Each structure stands twice: as structure tokens, then as C-alpha cells.
Amino acid sequence: MGMRRTFTPQRLVPAIAAGALVVGLGACGDDNSTADRPTVTAPNETIPPPDTVAPTTVAPGFEHPTGADEVVVEIAYEGGFLPADAAFRETPVLLVSGDGRLFVSGPQIAIYPGPLLPNVLVSDLGEDGIQALLDLAAEHGLLTEREYDRDDLIADAADTVVRISANGETYEHRAYALGLDTDETGDRAELQGFVAAATSELAMDGAAFQPEHYLVRATPVDDTSGFDVEPTIVEWPAESALLLADAGDCVAVPADSVDELFAEANQLTFFTQDDVTYQLSVRPQLPGDGC
């Protein structure tokens, strides 16, 4: 199957156009004539009473996780030449949860320093949208295990990662430097085509996501003088139960305790606690994510 679209991933500002996946339903007919067949009348035919409800026929489709914290489809860029703190902040380009919510990375404001919190939008994709997305994945051959050739002539690029859970299986597709400086062919072209179609046909006009928890990484800063813009130093709230010294890798923090603080902060807002200054990397906790 050949490539359908050309797509060059943008890591921080994915081009996700407004729109929605549309499910096409085909119908099949029977061309065989029944004119020559004898008509048989069944004896004592039973006709259901008027108040009997005919059984509902469930349309066939893909089985998938249905929990609010379970992931059906995820598209992300991982790795590449990024500092650990910057990599920690990154969220998937697209994520669909089992209950039909669609999460996308929204536009990022082009200022420095940027906001502390990533811009994640959420909308309702629904079951029809999930089925259409899984059908698109099947069309591109992604409901099976695949290995992808690696182009080592490109340095420090990210992996394009697509994870799909359907029909009791979970598939991870990982391709290095997908779509960068080359015309993709074969399986790489199919993966590229799926990413392009999914991210262009799913809407990004959702509402700002309000998480129950943020995932936080705190890095001590010994010298605050080496930045192009002078950092803002803020005292960490005394009433907070979080010890920043314990957040060197990752800690989940209830959102309602830090919402206002994080919303007003940028990436050069540093926090002090117990005479130590910390720089925070923060992302909202999405379905399937955690420390």
C-alpha cells in the first residue's frame, strides 16, 4: 500500500487542523434472484405482540479499552536532542482515551520564556470517532507488529511513536526521524500516512484540559545568573505538602493545590523551599500517564 500523504512532524507546535474523522459505512446487496424459488409458508407462524421490542443488532467494530484512564491511540515524539527537563514537559501530539476523549497538543505561544504549563486541549471524540480512527489504523496496516528501518544519517532526531490498543492487543510503532529529509516508502510510508491523516483530520478546537494531577520534576539551581532573561524567584507555598527535594525524578501533585500558582508561572519562574532554589518541569497527568 503506497503513501497517501506527506507529513513532516513538528515537535512543539503540531499542525492539527480543525475537522473530524467521518466514518463511511458501506452496504452490500444480494444480486441473486429469488424468482425461481418456491414460496414456503411456515405453519402456525408466530407474530410477536405489538409491544414486543425487536432485538437491537450491534454493528461490528473494533474492541478497545473503555476506561477513562486507558489509552486507545497515542501519537507522540520521543527522544531526540532535548534536555531531560524539556523532554519531561512534552505531551503526546494526540491521545484518545477509552471513554472517547480526544487530547491534543494545542498551539504554543511564541514568547520566551514560555508558560510553565503545556497547552493541552480536550474534546469529545465519541465511539464513532474511535472506530473511525481504528479503521484508519487498520487501513495503514498498523494493527499488527512491525519493525521499521532506521536512517542513521540523520542525527539527534526524535522517534515517531504510535501506540494502539484494539481487539485485545497493544501495538507500538516506533520509527526514527520519520519524514525528515527523505521520501518514505513501505512500512515507514504507511506509518507516516497514518500520523498525517490522524493529526490533520482530528479537531484541535477543544477546551483547555483541567487535570486532577500535575506531574512535577524539580531540579536544584545553584546559579540563576546564566540565563538570557532574569528568572523570577517565588517562595514555594508553605501549606503545600510537596517537598521539592523529593521531586527530583517525578511526583504527582493534586492540581487544585497548585493550579493558580502554575498558571501564573513561566519556564523561568523558579521556586525556593528550605533555602534551595528549584526549576520545575510540569505536565498535566493524562490518561495512562504517571510517575
Task: Please report, for each region that a protein language model flagged, where it lies by residue.
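Acidic/histidine-rich, surface-exposed loop or edge segments in extracytoplasmic proteins
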Residues: 101, 106-120, 175
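C-terminal motif of bacterial Sec signal peptides marking the signal peptidase cleavage site
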Residues: 23-27
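Second-shell loop/turn segments in exported
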Residues: 117-124, 181
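Short, well-ordered, aromatic-rich surface patches in folded extracellular/luminal domains
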Residues: 29-30, 40, 44-82, 86, ...
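Bacterial N-terminal signal peptides that target proteins for export
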Residues: 2-16
